[in-house]
Amino acid sequence: MDSVIIEPDEREALASLVPAHPLPPRKTHSYVEQCEQKPHHPIRKYSLDEGSRSVTSDSEAVYFDSSDGEFSTEGVAIVDGRTSGERGNGEECGFVTPPSKPASQGGGNDGGREDDIESLPEFIGAGGGLDVFKVPVRAAVNPGRPPCLELRPHPLRETQTGKFLRNIACTESQLWAGQENGVRFWNLEEAYEVGCGLGGQVRRGDEDTAPFHESVPTSPALCLLVDHGNRLVWTGHKDGKIRAWKMNQPNTTTADDSKPFKERLSWQAHRGPVNYIVISSYGDMWSCSDGGVIKIWTLDSLEKSLVLKLEEKHMAALLVERSGIDLRSQVTVNGTCSISSSDVKFLLVDTVKAKVWAVQHLSFSLWDAQNKELLKVFNIDGQVENRVDMPPTQGQQVEDTKAKFFSAPKKEKSQGFLQRSRHAIMGAAGAVRRAATRSAGAFAEDTRKVEAIAIAADGSIWTGSMNGVIAQWDGNGSRLREVNHHQQAVLCFCTFGDRIYVGYSSGYIQVLDLGGKLIASWVSHNEPVIKLAAGGGFIFSLATHGGVRGWYVTSPGPLDSLIRTELSQKEMAYARQDSVKILIGTWNVGEGRASRGALVSWLGSAVSDVGIVAIGLQEVDMGAGFLAMSTAKETVGVEGSAVGQWWLDAIGNALDERNTFERMGSRQLAGLLISLWVRKSIRTHVGDLDVAAVPCGFGRAIGNKGGVGLRIRVYDRIMCFVNCHLAAHLEAVTRRNADFNHIYRSMVFSKGQSVYTAAAAGASTSAQALKNNPNTNNSTEEEKSHLASADLVAFFGDFNYRLFGITYDEARDFISHRSFDWLREKDQLRQEMNEGKVFQGMREALITFPPTYKFEKNKPGLGGYDSGEKKRIPAWCDRVIYRDNQSISYTECSLKCPVVSSTIMYEACMDVTESDHKPVRCKLHANIAHTDKSVRRQELGKIVKSNEKLRAMFEELKSVPETSVSTNNILLHSQDTFIFTIRNTSNSSRAIFNIVCKGQTLVREDGEEPDNHSRGTFGLPRWLEVSPGAGIIKPDASLQVKVHHEDSHNSEEFIDGIQQNSLSEESSDKEVTLIIIVQGSCSTRTISHSIKVRHCSSAAKSLSLVHSKTTTMTKNLEGSTRYQTDANRGGSTRHRTDDSTRRG
């Protein structure tokens, strides 16, 4: 017998392995003899357990949990501009065999048998440790960002149809969320509790969510507003209604209660959707809608409606509806309106200057909250606009007309088929380029649109745009500065203390100081952050997929490392492991169709124990006409063909998709088609299918060559499957390598056909359009490949790599003797992988089947190789290559290496003759480690409650700077002004204050009981001005607050938008209680001072007010209240000689 022939690189790899125990005697056979005796006899394997080596040390690696931030490889927190280190150098190629493992390992239910799984030897390409080809390193707890409270883990997208979360808002003890079908809220005291589980009553997608309570079904909730004064949460809805919900819902004290709660009040506010609602400094509710509509619902009408009984809801709704004030009609003169008719997307209340900002995408309008007057209209550059309601331009129509004329075909002389085909293809490519060029200007304008607005504690206004620019404005609408820390769209803001939190479309959260300087940055979600909210000691973030996380207000800081260390030690409590078998099939069908028998032979005979099936086809349909049509369809977001649909249906029938498998999705690009099926028994653990396409033909514009991909979440880990057709011809090795590199780096996944951009045929998403826009300066963090961050990536298809340095006859001779070991030495792909030029760091099982190209159709056996004039040399064009979380050596499956795979089948179906290629199938066995999010959240709660150091840190957050107020009683007459002082007596902490009105009392002259009128929304009465109404006081400093009486504002009531003035209150003295709420820069508790302000209707009615001690009210997070006297505090500044007579 001949000895086994091993290639030099394989011999070096095997020689480097040093087993811990002596290996049993190994039988030696030549591959020829082996294949003659039994075509697929397993080769005896070497154990690699003791020979494992990691390419990168843990201290050098970039960690992130794929279940948290799998689409971004740069999950690194940035603090004061410092980032974590880079990973190591490139890996070398190798030839390894993973150890056999039992099929029952893990809890996966993929129909697998319980016998041992024999893994095949695999060749590993070099270069896997460089650039985007680094293997992503995971960890049980991500050290690249602060630890978080996962209130609602990322649900699978398909479970959220019709009930996606759209926004969030936070109270002192609750987090509310607006949904597509209503609202829900969480009690924060239950935030660390376990979820209801699969057996609970909660719908699919919320099994691991912390206990929550849900409302009755409604129209989609587009916005939320917390009203602390009335203890209500207001919501604006797509159907134009505004609804009020009580914070203290009855019968929701326990998590077991599943009865939906109902709204307290609702009315028809707008004809279109309610885009935003706010409550002004004077207690009025402002709402906005499409078409430039802004309405005001006065405090008086709201309060009257809220005192009505529940049985009188209809009357209450009618009362509010008739009180609405349409501001657009009030600023329209002779048919010309002073504000734009474009949609009003946001409203912002400036509590410092008592103003309201209305935000349209490219302009702002500034309003006086007290008298509802329009103050200013200006654009995003800060330039004042006198008239903005102009008729729309026809420029785009003209351009479209020009495009039609320019693209019209001209009569030409008769041409040959190839010439006409070339013109058709290049004409389609030219149309794509013209469309992209024509839309570039509009795209640049769109990137400047305002997507978010917020007010900081110092009264500065911050806006964020699609291009990542953050602009700072003063309260008068003057643009002060702009910063740009991230080249992605700003989607939301949140302010807490003296910090500004920014949420980006990339999933990043950044923390800025009041000057716009970057403090910290981290990847919070794998999808865009659409809303941020502060409360309960957390900054809560909501991503587009519906996941909700809470970040501690101290993060990043010392608290993070303590929690991370403790939680990592609890890994065994929440780590879980499952397994699944994956069948991957590839076939170049040569524009033909297959019989059912061929499909069953290829796929049906191999799926009995498989959980996932990924199929890639090439040359489904070709020809110049089809390619041109396909390119044109791609430009308008349409893909697929009748032939492609036939293949999907035929393969589905072969897989028995009605009973056994479920088709998850597909993507077609010209002749390339990829589709994926999942066994129904594991369907609840698989979802979030995304698609992608990258053309490589004709200047990267046409899909005759290229790749199509599917990305899917399996047991909370990300797997990517890419079907490729690379450049043809023996000498085009460099082009094939370049095609792979282009596909790997350019593939951007999206949620489906509706989000495909029309800018270019190969543009997969709008995100890629933003990335490729020449006006956008991209940083390295956006240039990372989506494939680089996946846990498992499988490439398959017609790679077109050929055999080199060998003749047709020599190749046929080797094949007839099954001497595949000699042929592999002539394989272009093996050589290029060996040199680290392509498929860097990826694996391919040892090929033990004959070359799959090129055959004569319908000619069986090995005699079917091409015997025509060209006599193309047989080659292994059709391949399957993959990588998982392992580096070169075998690694045990764990949360640090969550996907560990091996090849258990790799063969060609030589009996199928419908094409000039043979179909290939490969079966992978994947062990998958993942986290039980519900249990981990519970473990986090135990750590927070039991760790003494953490408890001490949380206690420190309750500290509030000592402050004093110069008076607690103010007496005003008509047009009087009084100035009092708030002093921060702390020498180290800044004090942040906000002034609200608790209530109003009408003092009767006839000695009757005073008429107490609570200010439910904490709004000021219209006769009183307080300036500033909020701000920051530096350590050991003071700030003056002006209180002014305005006698021109009477009690207002509006009926059908017409003001009804009431003068009954003018004869009575009025008294209000101002509450000054004070907190520190990072306080979770507040201290309040109260001041009584009394207005006398005439000088003769002046009363001597008895000076009393200032009372402070301290409110902690649990809602308890304590009172303490303020009489002996030092540092008070008095701006009056007598509280009862001094007037400003």
Swiss-Prot record:
Cofactor requirements of the protein: Mg(2+)
Any one GO molecular-function label of the UniProt entry: phosphatidylinositol-3,4,5-trisphosphate 5-phosphatase activity
Region (Catalytic 1): 791-807
Region (Disordered): 15-67, 81-118, 1111-1144
Coiled-coil residue windows: none
Record keywords: Hydrolase, Isopeptide bond, Magnesium, Metal-binding, Repeat, Ubl conjugation, WD repeat
Cross-link annotation Glycyl lysine isopeptide (Lys-Gly) (interchain with G-Cter in ubiquitin), location: K949
SMART domains listed in its UniProt record: IPPc, WD40
UniProt cross-references to InterPro entries, sorted A to Z: Beta-prop_IP5PC_F, Endo/exonu/phosph_ase_sf, Ig-like_IP5PC_F, IP5, IPPc, WD40/YVTN_repeat-like_dom_sf, WD40_rpt
UniProt feature, compositional bias: Polar residues: 1111-1131
Annotated EC: 3.1.3.36, 3.1.3.86
Cystine bridges: none
One of the GO BP terms on file: phosphatidylinositol dephosphorylation
Tissue specificity remark: Expressed in young seedlings and flowers.
Reactions catalysed according to its record: a 1,2-diacyl-sn-glycero-3-phospho-(1D-myo-inositol-4,5-bisphosphate) + H2O = a 1,2-diacyl-sn-glycero-3-phospho-(1D-myo-inositol 4-phosphate) + phosphate; a 1,2-diacyl-sn-glycero-3-phospho-(1D-myo-inositol-3,4,5-trisphosphate) + H2O = a 1,2-diacyl-sn-glycero-3-phospho-(1D-myo-inositol-3,4-bisphosphate) + phosphate; 1D-myo-inositol 1,4,5-trisphosphate + H2O = 1D-myo-inositol 1,4-bisphosphate + phosphate
Ranges where the record places region Catalytic 2: 870-885
Entry keyword annotation includes Secreted: no
One Pfam family from the record: Ig-like_IP5PC_F
Annotated family: Belongs to the inositol polyphosphate 5-phosphatase family.
Role this protein plays: Has phosphatase activity toward PtdIns(4,5)P2, PtdIns(3,4,5)P3 and Ins(1,4,5)P3.
Protein name stated in the entry: Type II inositol polyphosphate 5-phosphatase 14
Source organism (scientific name): Arabidopsis thaliana (Mouse-ear cress)
Gene behind this protein: IP5P14
